[in-house]
Regions:
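Sec/Tat signal peptide C-region and signal peptidase I cleavage site
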Residues: 4-9
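Small-residue-enriched, tightly packed secondary-structure blocks
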Residues: 10-173
């Protein structure tokens, strides 16, 4: 008779992996925030005055006729971590390539923030993000309580496509 038992050694590899992934994502989130601040110093006002923000350190996007994007991020109100979020996007139209970018969504007030937290938040095709480059945020305002900025990380993508972004929110326990 063959018997397999598990010995408890005080180590749960699943918990360690989760903790390691958490540390990696925390570093990536901090690096993304630093990148947004450094690319456009005038973005400081959004960080100071916004009720909250959702930041996605890496959104991977690709397409060949039909495309998609996915990213995971963190959601803050007044610099306090409230939870995590995922971003999904499906597009159709003329598109070819792949790219990675960072995305940040600022929420002007509690109403906009709560809409994000308590529903399946979605941006339609008519809402667009602004590329965060020096000085651009000085001329950018909120639309429907949100302001969205992106920074390219890598890749090249040609597209004339239509699609929206859908978000989910998972509060901290």
């Amino acid at each position: 008779v063959l018997s397999i038992t598990s010995a408890q050694a005080g180590w749960d590899p699943n918990k360690s992996e989760t903790a390691a992934n958490q540390n990696i994502q925390d570093y990536e989130v901090q690096q993304a925030i630093t990148d947004f601040r450094n690319n456009d110093p005038s973005m400081k006002v959004f960080f100071e005055k916004a009720y909250g923000f959702a930041i996605f350190p890496t959104v991977a996007k690709g397409g060949l006729g039909i495309g998609g994007a996915y990213g995971e991020g963190k959601v803050y109100s007044k610099d306090v971590l409230n939870g995590t979020s995922s971003l999904m996007q499906f597009t159709f139209g003329l598109q070819l390539g792949g790219q990675a970018y960072r995305e940040i969504i600022f929420f002007k007030d509690k109403t906009a923030f709560d809409l994000f937290k308590y529903g399946n938040f979605e941006f339609g095709a008519q809402v667009s993000a602004v590329a965060a480059t020096a000085g651009v945020s000085a001329n950018t305002d909120y639309s429907n309580g949100v302001a969205i900025f992106t920074i390219a990380k890598s890749g090249l993508m040609f597209e004339a496509s239509v699609g929206g972004q859908k978000f989910s929110f998972e509060p901290l326990n």
